[in-house]
Swiss-Prot record:
Keyword terms: ATP-binding, Kinase, Nucleotide biosynthesis, Nucleotide-binding, Transferase
The protein's name: Thymidylate kinase
Pfam families listed in its UniProt record: Thymidylate_kin
NCBIfam families associated with the record: DTMP_kinase
SUPFAM superfamilies: P-loop containing nucleoside triphosphate hydrolases
Species name: Pediococcus pentosaceus (strain ATCC 25745 / CCUG 21536 / LMG 10740 / 183-1w)
Family of the protein in this entry: Belongs to the thymidylate kinase family.
Source species, domain of life: Bacteria
Length: 209
């Protein structure tokens, strides 16, 4: 089996992590120890330490560019320590977020500029991108409603942003999907969960079968 790098993306409230876990359960028996599941920011001790700083809701004074640079630093370490070694072993890598998240959240959400953040991350990753990206799309209003309903005890600093921030994030994701149609597959995440899982499995089966 050849290695495959697959990322899962989506605005807050899209159910991304829930869907990713369902995909792990679906493919675990088939792939066994050839499946590597990781997340961003995180995936190794250094990147997890950076994650704690980024998402701490007490860090309200964090500058936008500081945030973007921290994400890029965590991503670099994640790539060289976790993702690339797994791919060299011909593993399938399921990654909860990658470069597209920074472009959407810091580039558009924080208004730093999507091109600037893209170039920053090209430097960090030396151009490495997922083979396929599953983008779970949900209207911002619905996403925020889900956050407040289901995640009241586990809300991080980015979840606390206002509606216009999340609308900019979603718009940037959709722009990326238009720019990279061969890599990014848009899934309607406003559907029932079983329907979302069915659509994602249909995409992944084309890669993994």
């Amino acid at each position: 089996m050849n290695g495959h790098f697959i990322s899962f993306e989506g605005p807050d409230g899209a159910g991304k992590t829930t869907v990713l876990q369902a995909m792990v359960e679906h493919y675990q028996q088939r792939l066994k120890d050839q499946l590597t599941v990781t997340r961003e920011p995180g995936g190794n001790p250094i990147s997890e330490a950076i994650r704690t700083i980024i998402l701490d809701k007490n860090n309200t004074e964090m500058d936008e560019r500081t945030e973007a640079l921290l994400y890029a630093a965590a991503r670099r370490q994640h790539l060289v320590e976790t993702i690339l070694p797994a791919l060299k072993k011909n593993h399938v890598v399921f990654c909860d977020r990658f470069v597209d998240s920074s472009i959407a959240y810091q580039g558009a959400g924080r208004k730093i500029g999507t091109d600037a953040v893209y170039q920053m991350n090209l430097f960090a990753t030396e151009g490495a991108l997922p083979e396929k990206t599953i983008y779970l799309d949900v209207p911002s209003e619905l996403g925020l409603k889900r956050i407040m309903t289901h995640r009241t005890e586990d809300v991080d600093r980015l979840d606390l942003e206002q509606l216009d921030f999340h609308q900019r994030v979603r718009s940037a994701y959709l722009d990326l999907a238009k720019k990279f149609p061969d890599r990014i597959v848009v899934i309607d995440a406003s559907q029932e969960l079983d329907d979302v899982k069915r659509d994602v499995i249909e995409v992944l089966d084309q890669i993994l079968n």
